[in-house]
Amino acid sequence: MSRVNAVRIHRNGGPEELRHEEIEIGDPGPGEARVQHTAIGLNFTDIHHRTGRYPLPQFPHVIGMEAAGVVEAVGAGVSEVRPGDRVAYASDRPRAYSQATVMPITRLVKLPDFIDDETAAAVILKGLTAQYLIRAAHPVSAGETILIQAAAGGVGLIMCQWARHLGARRAHRDLEARRTVGSSILLP
């Protein structure tokens, strides 16, 4: 067991419900790693958990869905990561607003040297969402025209850039902001 600082809520509400507290986290079990956070992503999902729009199973609860950091320890049988590895994750449940957490290794992505921890923590959840939409929900191909309706947010911006890289034409409604990410068609 380790004691770490965390930000938790004891009930739903505004930002005044965020409390800085010390909590205990366990040791990693089979298929898990303990990650010491170096950067934490902030998302609308976190606000929705805090306000109660996305209910939490119980209180008090740590919120936060994405972070980056360094593996501190691994559970039995874990060979995919080892202590000292830099990783990022998009969590299966809120737990990122803390100094460290225990995470299933299936959620961890090793970070290459050219991606810093702050960038990884800020983009992984949005990037995985964009990846799902562009690769799984509808595989986008060169020459195809796609409409990105909400291109001003994190997911939309990543989708614009990714679609451009794939050679697809992008149509957007947010004229000025979309010019900066290479939109091919701008809708008034």
PLM region spans:
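Glycine-rich beta-strand-centered segment in the early N-terminal region that forms part
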Residues: 24-41, 51-95
